[in-house]
Amino acid sequence: TMKTLKPSVKIYGVMPVGSAVYVESRRQGQLVTLDHCSSMADAVVRKTGEEYLYPYIEKYVDDIFTVTEDSIRQAVRTACLYGKLTLEGSGALALAALLEKKCPLSPGTVLICSGGNIDKAVLDLCMQA
């Protein structure tokens, strides 16, 4: 992992406010189940986090930020208009965190924006934002 190769590397995660199972799990010190969850970032919507994944998050992820649905839509729109990228909601989470000024930026900062499986109606909604 990057942390093994260079322990000073900071790794951050981003989750939608409406489905922040790993944020709540970290807060409670154990994997939890949410009562309700929803987000346009449907690839990361989980009531319960993945049991196999949680220990890796605890070990390697320095912090997890949450972003709003408005920011996710704005990130999809920004990527499309200025980056010529079509991103689904989940793929736009890192950019949404940057737009909300939640990501600490320094030289060498990398944002991973991956995933373009977005419904045309959802993309149209984002483009109207």
Where do the model's predicted regions map?
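PLP-dependent amino-acid enzyme catalytic core
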Residues: 1-129
